[in-house]
């Protein structure tokens, strides 16, 4: 899984940059960062990442769940939600998109490593 290509979709720039730094320090290749669903769809098409880390609350008119649903249907790329939302309705709605994982903010590096470091993503695509 190390050296995997990752797209970060996060509306909080500071969180996104911090996440990028931590992922790169762990050996992952962060392709890009975007803060909205439309850009996420375009960057997914252009860069074909191995994994997308997706916030639910995004800038623009499409949220992370709708974006993940479209990515799943069009590209079959695994998505891990990184979000502050942990209510039942949001989790239920997110689960329809068949996410690879769901991490509630605030999170630690080890939370991401547990999901990404098990090697299952290699056989997912």
Give residue ranges: language-model regions.
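A short, hydrophobic beta-strand element within the central beta-sheet of small alpha/beta folds
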Residues: 76-86
């Amino acid at each position: 899984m190390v050296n995997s290509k990752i797209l970060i979709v996060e509306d909080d720039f500071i969180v996104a940059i911090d996440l990028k730094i931590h992922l790169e320090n762990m050996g992952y290749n962060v392709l890009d960062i975007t803060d909205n669903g439309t850009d996420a769809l375009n960057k997914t098409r252009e860069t074909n990442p191995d994994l997308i880390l997706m916030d639910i609350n995004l800038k623009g008119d499409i949220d992370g769940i709708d974006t993940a649903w479209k990515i799943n249907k069009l590209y079959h790329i695994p998505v891990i939600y990184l979000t502050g939302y942990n209510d039942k309705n949001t989790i239920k709605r997110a689960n329809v998109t068949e996410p690879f994982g769901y991490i509630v903010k605030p999170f630690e590096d080890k939370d991401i490593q547990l999901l990404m470091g098990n090697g299952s993503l290699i056989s997912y695509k």
